[in-house]
Amino acid sequence: MTIVLTKEELLAKAKKPAEDAMRLHPFYRGKVQVAPKCPIRNVVDDFAVWYTPGVAAPCRAIQENPDLAYEYSSKSNTVAIITDSTRVQGLQVGFAERDIRAVAGLPLMEGKALLFKYLGGVDAIPICLGTQDPDEIVLATKWLQPSFGGVNLEDISQPKCFRVLDKLRSDPDVEIPVWHDDQQGTATVILAGLINALRIVGKRWDEIRVALIGAGAVNVPLLPFLVASGVKLGNVVVCDSKGILHPERKDVEQKKDDYAGKWQICMESNAEGRRGGIAEAMRGADVCVAASRPGPNAILPEWVAAMADESIVFTLANPIPEIWPWEAKEAGARVVGTSRGDFPNQINNSLVFPGIFRGVLDVRAKTITDEMAIAAAEEVACWQQEKGVDEEHIVPTIEDADVFPREAAAVGVKAQEQGLARLSLSHAELLSRAEQTIRQAQDMTQFLMDKGFIQPLPEK
């Protein structure tokens, strides 16, 4: 039985992680470190191999064949986490974007690197760029690509996050996968949740009506995933802070160079030609995905009540969802998900990005396509189906460690099917490799804790 907390209790609970973070971050002075992968038995003899003069031989080999960097260096398991910190949680309120310091994003990027390592066995390096210019971010990423097997773009404000991702994905000179987790990762988890939620309510993709509340970095990239799954674009109504998107939205048309995806939605969705706001967008909808402003009361119970029977409602605002889950349920929603871990059905991108990158690195993929992300979503949904799907269990949690290798294998197979992999490995080989790599990362962390190399948490 779910324990329902009051608003005051939830707010107090929401403050505790920040209080603990201010106590623990200065104690550990960072969350990730670089550690040797090779033996060091004798400084003189071993460093003659690992450094000069011996290292000249693999350097020459890579010069002749750049793909050998995956064999002779850490490139094959290293990802860059690239940000300008303009969308970092805690910096968006009280600071003008131009005044945000890139270095202020380091604690968050280190936390991301920690998740990469522990859940995916991926070595991730935080890189906070001292520029907010999208073209310079693109250029810096291209300059850095020789050192990395992949790039995770993180916490870059819109609309430049769309521009940066699109330019890097379409650039023929970029030969490593580039992923924007705020866009693609969240869309992947939402899709996984909807796959199982629709099974519960017994509805088909090609029949449902969808309301997307918020037209930013979550819902705009989600729409192609929904269409690929069978949703009819005309059955989707998207609403931003100024109302429903439609062809007469001149404010969007005037900015279509920066918001190309949003303008396309204006032109191609909403076949009924609806006008109005959130209430009108949600009326009669089978599914509502809200990624807008924190609640409560950003979405009202009567708007949920006006949805179709057996409705599905995902409210993803932080720290408080647009409507409390129990209010959505009382108003008639059958399945409810939020971005919070203290409610059932947490929709969080941490469930997918470690496994997806594990898969693309293991086959040395050249890019991450929507089809690869959809394959990961389907595998996440399948994992939960095997464990049991019900109204409060539509996706796994990050504690379900064995879901990540399965995502990796599914993504690796899809990359090969699309001709985007440098290596050819079977599903069984990919699964085994991912399991071993992730287990090793977690065992190493436990060993460092057991031996005191990672200090125990200090007393309060």
What do these predicted regions represent?
Residues 2-178, 414, 441, 445-459:
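N-terminal ligand-binding/catalytic initiation module
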Residues 70-75, 117-118, 143-145, 169-172, ...:
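Solvent-exposed alpha-helices and their adjacent loops that cap or buttress functional pockets
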Residues 89, 96-110, 120, 172, ...:
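Glycine-rich phosphate/diphosphate-binding loop of Rossmann-like nucleotide-binding domains
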Residues 126, 152-155, 178-181, 238, ...:
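General beta-strand structural signal in soluble alpha/beta enzymes
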Residues 163-167, 172, 243, 404-440:
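Terminal amphipathic helices with adjacent charged low-complexity linkers/tails
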Residues 181, 201-203, 312-427, 448-451:
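Adenosine-phosphate binding glycine-rich loop
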Residues 260-334, 340-342:
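Rossmann-like adenosine-cofactor binding region
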